[in-house]
């Protein structure tokens, strides 16, 4: 069955893509968001969910999670016009009659215009690389933490030795029943002060050990098997939740296959965010132009212009005068 053609498809479900989708909904067009990750929010939600952001207009400070929650709440006003596709990576798109055919790793989509808001490319968590890991993912195996309270009273095992792993371990110390950190080296890569706090905490530290296997029933992991580096010693750690904090890898390899003009790793755009291909626009960190400032606030400002230009491209004969939101929403 052929997928219906949406007015605008937004590639990327980070802050800029979410706001662009909201604004497109405000303008009364249909929107599809295609996001490579299993959740919306992009880097703020994934890489620094609990860290404070200070340069969002009208917010003295808010966390990455709070920013994402606010954007999704704003977006939900137009949920009848917006479709969200998660865990889909855009491979190619081609001009077809009436718009574009967009091929992902899962499906083929159709859109009258495209707005690229994928930042520096698709990014994904670095995994343990163990058999059956995917089976436990998002059940009780996590690659990032949004709500610390979900681990209350649990036996939590954290794999990793960077800032996020150490920060989560310290934050969970007084929430979880127990916290164990497994790191492949004796030395941690986190901030010195954080490491000092960790070594004097009640967190169990197992170094240098590497994960070897996961055991569980159904979608729930129950034990992590670890082995001491360069030794035969093997331990089985009982757990209620496992947090893997190996960081994220980014890739813009597909972006380079989209037959657009590029400046380094970004897409060259006009002052109206038009790419070298008519009907395709780019905003946020994905877009390159002289004087560009790579801030979330900058991308928020770019989104309405790109959406309005996309609507002008799709419906050139329509009265496309921009109306303030105070006149559009009761």
Curated annotation (Swiss-Prot):
* GO MF term list: ferredoxin-NADP+ reductase activity; flavin adenine dinucleotide binding; NADP binding
Look up the coiled coil feature and give its residue ranges.
Answer: none
Keyword Flavoprotein tagged:
yes
Q: What cofactor requirement does the entry state?
A: FAD
SUPFAM superfamilies with a match to the protein in the record: FAD/NAD(P)-binding domain (SSF51905)
Binding positions for FAD per the UniProt entry? 35, 43, 48, 90, 123, 285, 326
According to UniProt, the reaction catalysed is: 2 reduced [2Fe-2S]-[ferredoxin] + NADP(+) + H(+) = 2 oxidized [2Fe-2S]-[ferredoxin] + NADPH
Relay the cofactor remark from the entry.
Binds 1 FAD per subunit.
EC class, as a word, reads oxidoreductase
Which proteins does it associate with, and in what oligomeric form? Homodimer.
Q: Which PANTHER family match?
A: THIOREDOXIN REDUCTASE 1-RELATED-RELATED
Family assignment from sequence similarity = Belongs to the ferredoxin--NADP reductase type 2 family.
Protein name as annotated:
Ferredoxin--NADP reductase
- What is the protein's species of origin? Streptococcus pyogenes serotype M28 (strain MGAS6180)
């Amino acid at each position: 069955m052929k997928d219906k053609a949406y007015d605008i498809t937004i590639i990327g479900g980070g802050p800029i893509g979410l706001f662009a989708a909201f604004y497109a909904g405000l303008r009364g067009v249909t929107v599809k968001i295609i996001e490579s990750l299993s959740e919306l929010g992009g880097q703020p939600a994934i890489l620094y969910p609990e860290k404070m952001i200070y340069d969002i207009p009208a917010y003295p400070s808010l966390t990455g999670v709070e920013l994402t929650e606010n954007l999704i709440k704003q977006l939900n006003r137009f949920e009848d016009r917006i479709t969200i596709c998660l865990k889909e990576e855009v491979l190619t798109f081609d001009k077809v009659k009436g718009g574009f055919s967009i091929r992902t790793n899962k499906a083929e989509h159709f859109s009258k215009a495209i707005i690229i808001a994928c930042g520096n490319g698709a990014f994904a968590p670095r995994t343990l690389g163990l058999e059956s890991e995917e089976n436990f993912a998002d059940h009780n195996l996590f690659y990032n933490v949004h709500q610390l309270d979900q681990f209350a009273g649990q036996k939590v095992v954290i794999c990793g030795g960077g800032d996020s792993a150490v920060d989560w371990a310290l934050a969970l110390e007084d929430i979880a029943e127990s916290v164990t950190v497994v790191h492949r080296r004796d030395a941690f890569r986190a901030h010195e002060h954080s490491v000092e706090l960790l070594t004097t905490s009640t967190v169990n530290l197992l170094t240098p050990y590497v994960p070897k296997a996961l055991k569980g029933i159904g979608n729930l992991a129950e034990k992590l098997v670890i082995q001491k580096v360069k030794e035969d010693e093997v331990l089985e750690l009982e757990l209620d939740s496992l947090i893997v904090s190996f960081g994220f890898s980014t890739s813009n390899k597909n972006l380079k296959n989209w037959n657009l003009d590029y400046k380094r790793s970004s897409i060259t755009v006009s002052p109206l965010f038009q790419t070298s291909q008519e009907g395709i626009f780019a905003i946020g960190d994905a877009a390159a132009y002289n004087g560009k400032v790579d801030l979330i606030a900058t991308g928020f400002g770019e989104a309405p212009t790109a959406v309005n230009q996309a609507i002008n491209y799709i419906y050139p004969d329509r009265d496309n005068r921009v109306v303030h939101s105070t006149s559009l929403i009761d």
